[in-house]
């Protein structure tokens, strides 16, 4: 897929408390089916492909295989593909695409044409989050491939449909949610019609107060700072359109802020004093009279040291500084006395970064590196800082060079389906590694160019092949690449076979 065909995120920088809105442009087309008669939805079917940009070329994909493209005399935003009565030759899973800037754009949503009843299940999703709290308008979006239907919302445990919404000119309906529970939706083409298959179930929780945001120290600030330095902290909420607050202990920090997205804010701390390193949290509040502040984030810590105290001693266990991959390494930082905070610092191609901060009861901190790999290689040192005035800090310890040779741990790849995949469906493969902050790559056997890429800070990532057809059958593996200046590439995972039904 070309860069032009990728999703475009166009953000504007704001120095206000939070950016009011962001512009999101998705170049993918939309596809829907229209029935000639609601009483007989499969008797005369037309598929309509609508593009957000004008184009002269449309293409229908059936069961993962592209059909003959349609060339128009003049640019248009939509094209209609008449199927007529649904038969064995027209039954299938459809998507559409269009050509923009000489490249075919990523395919549309899936429309299932079965020719049978009950009608295919719709999809259901939550907006903006899957929980409710005072002051928040949570909704459920029910989406069908068939236009002009009546949508039905069901709450688990209720005998009747909870709500009914007609959508004569649309393929979706939005339902407000006021109760926690398990929801699904279906649709029908006329009042006496049989409801479609139900959608998957989504769970709505009631959370009061709202869940905590995340607070992180920006990379340039995640080092040992001198008093008088500046630092940046980023607070990210699980939804947009909220007011943020930075606190240290119970006291609000009225500092400059900026935002590039309505779900986050950057706090800028200037002229930091020696004792300004610990205890930062953030929270958010919906813009409603009923809204309460969220739970506090986990605390973020800065390390400020004036270098006036004696250097600590840093030692390793085992003493061998070329451990085997997968081993446990313990780095011990010892100060002349107790009552201090310790920071472990690593220097690599990306510079000096604080790895961890500990506040033990005694004069020694023990930093554990579990399952070490090549990404843990670097020059380690440590410092300590007084936790009481005047908050003096130490010189850095002597450096220990830790070198872990050998390949990175291999990732694991598994398919999120069983058996042969139905043509036209998406193939979702989950790649998982023990290393954080990596890009996962999906590769087909014998090919070097990745077919899908996904970034993950922690945990697995789902790699998706859209609208698979017989041409996608084969063997797949994944690998990952670490971020930063010292980029490392893992070995391939064990292979997973993708079988496509009928091929």
UniProtKB/Swiss-Prot annotation:
Plasma. It is found in: Secreted. Keywords: Disulfide bond, Glycoprotein, Immunoglobulin domain, Repeat, Secreted, Signal. It comes from Bos taurus. Disulfide bonds join 49-96, 142-185, 235-282, 333-382, 431-478. Residues 1-21 form the signal peptide. InterPro entries: A1B_glyco/leuk_Ig-like_rcpt, Ig-like_dom, Ig-like_dom_sf, Ig-like_fold, Ig-like_Receptors_ImmuneReg, Ig_sub, Ig_sub2, Immunoglobulin_dom. Glycans are attached at residues 137, 182, 379. This is Alpha-1B-glycoprotein.
């Amino acid at each position: 897929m070309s860069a032009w065909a990728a999703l475009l995120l166009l953000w504007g920088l704001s120095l206000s408390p939070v950016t009011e809105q962001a512009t999101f442009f998705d170049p993918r087309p939309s596809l829907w089916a229209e029935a000639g008669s609601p009483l007989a939805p499969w008797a005369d079917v037309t598929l309509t492909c609508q593009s957000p940009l004008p184009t002269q070329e449309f293409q229908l994909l059936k069961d993962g295989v592209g059909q003959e493209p349609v060339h128009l005399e003049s640019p248009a935003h939509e094209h209609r593909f008449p199927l007529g009565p649904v038969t064995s030759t027209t039954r299938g899973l459809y998507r559409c695409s269009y050509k923009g800037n000489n490249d075919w754009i990523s395919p549309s949503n899936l429309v299932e044409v079965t020719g049978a009843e009950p009608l295919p299940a719709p999809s259901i999703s939550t907006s903006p989050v899957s929980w409710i709290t005072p002051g928040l308008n949570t909704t459920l979006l029910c989406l069908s491939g068939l236009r002009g239907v009546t949508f039905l919302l069901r709450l688990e445990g209720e005998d009747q449909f909870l709500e009914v919404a007609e959508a004569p000119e649309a393929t979706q309906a939005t339902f407000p949610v006021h109760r926690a529970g398990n929801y699904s939706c279906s649709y029908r083409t006329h009042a006496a019609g049989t409801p479609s298959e139900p959608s998957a179930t989504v769970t709505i929780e009631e959370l009061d107060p709202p869940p905590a945001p995340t607070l992180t120290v920006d990379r340039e600030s995640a080092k040992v700072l001198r008093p008088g330095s500046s630092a940046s902290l980023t607070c990210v909420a699980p939804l947009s359109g909220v007011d943020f607050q930075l606190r240290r202990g119970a006291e609000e920090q009225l500092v400059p802020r900026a935002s590039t997205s309505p779900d986050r804010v950057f706090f800028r701390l200037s002229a930091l004093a020696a004792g300004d390193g610990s205890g930062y949290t953030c929270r958010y509040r919906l813009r409603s009279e009923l809204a309460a502040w969220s739970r506090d984030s986990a605390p973020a810590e800065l390390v400020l040291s004036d270098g006036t105290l004696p250097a600590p001693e840093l030692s390793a266990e085992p003493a061998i500084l070329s451990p085997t991959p997968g081993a446990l390494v313990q780095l011990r930082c010892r100060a002349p006395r107790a009552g201090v905070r310790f920071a472990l610092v690593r220097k690599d191609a990306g510079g000096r970064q604080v790895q961890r901060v500990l506040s033990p009861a005694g004069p020694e901190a023990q930093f554990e590196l579990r399952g070490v790999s090549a990404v843990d290689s670097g020059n380690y040192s440590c410092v300590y800082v007084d936790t009481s005035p005047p908050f003096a800090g130490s010189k850095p310890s002597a450096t220990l060079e830790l070198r872990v040779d050998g390949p990175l741990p291999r990732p694991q790849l598994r398919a999120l389906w069983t058996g042969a995949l139905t043509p036209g469906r998406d193939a979702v493969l989950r790649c998982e590694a023990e290393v954080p902050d990596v890009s996962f790559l999906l590769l087909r056997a014998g090919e070097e160019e990745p077919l899908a890429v996904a970034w993950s800070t922690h945990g697995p990532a789902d790699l998706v092949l859209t609208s698979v057809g017989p041409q996608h059958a084969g063997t797949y593996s994944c690998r990952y690449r670490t971020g930063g200046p010292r980029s490392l590439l893992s070995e391939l995972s064990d292979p997973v076979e993708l079988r496509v039904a009928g091929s």
